[in-house]
Amino acid sequence: MAVISMKQLLEAGVHFGHQTRRWNPKMAKYIFTERNGIYIIDLQKTVKKVDEAYNFVRELAAEGGNVLFVGTKKQAQDTIKEEAIRSGMFFINERWLGGTLTNFSTIKKRINRLKQLEKMEEDGTFEVLPKKEVIILKKEMTRLEKFLGGIKDMPGVPDALFIVDPRKERIAIAEAHKLNIPIVAIVDTNCDPDEIDYVIPANDDAIRAVKLLTSKMADAIIEAKQGEEEVAEEAVATEAEATEAE
């Protein structure tokens, strides 16, 4: 059975592409027709592609891999954060900082600085410092949290990226390519699908469409993790039974 139904996709407006004058010819194979100057995406292909992406993400998560959710456009920001947190993964929903992947050691230093400031706030250090200094430090902490909060617990470079709108996230894609990190992405009719390993042809501007598809990728991770938990529970139960038998 498919991970997602045609009905769900239609209701979320996943089929609406961009205006016909704003298109990438490489997306032609994913286009069903044109209506009132707008391309209509072939949802049968979207269903198939969601299945492929879901299976890839689930298998990656089952092997302990990390997925970085990326969506800095307004329509994606909230969903990217919510679904990454729900699935226990990491996210970037503000500006992508150059070198986030290719220069992770430098980014890690900034993350350590953020954690240091958070600790200072928690342990009461701010209370004994001059007010002016505290204001400056809090400003720095807020800024670091804004850009790095979603990756501050990420142990290293992620094993895959999930991206909303490849045109918007060109730097992230270029960095992932340099490091051979696979990319899953919601790809609209104005994007280049050749840059993406797992293309999900869909409307990347409608909040409902972005929410539906992003939540499915989060579901794949959760399903994999639940499977791990069940395997661990079974192992504990088997061990207990073996001990009793002795």
From Swiss-Prot:
Record CDD domains: RPS2
Matching InterPro entries: Ribosomal_uS2, Ribosomal_uS2_bac/mit/plastid, Ribosomal_uS2_CS, Ribosomal_uS2_flav_dom_sf
Keywords, sorted A to Z: Ribonucleoprotein, Ribosomal protein
Cellular-component GO terms for this entry: cytosolic small ribosomal subunit
Disulphide linkage map: none
Coiled-coil residue windows: none
Family annotation (PANTHER family): 30S RIBOSOMAL PROTEIN S2 PROKARYOTIC AND ORGANELLAR (PTHR12534), SMALL RIBOSOMAL SUBUNIT PROTEIN US2M (PTHR12534:SF0)
Name by which UniProt lists this protein: Small ribosomal subunit protein uS2
Gene it is expressed from: rpsB
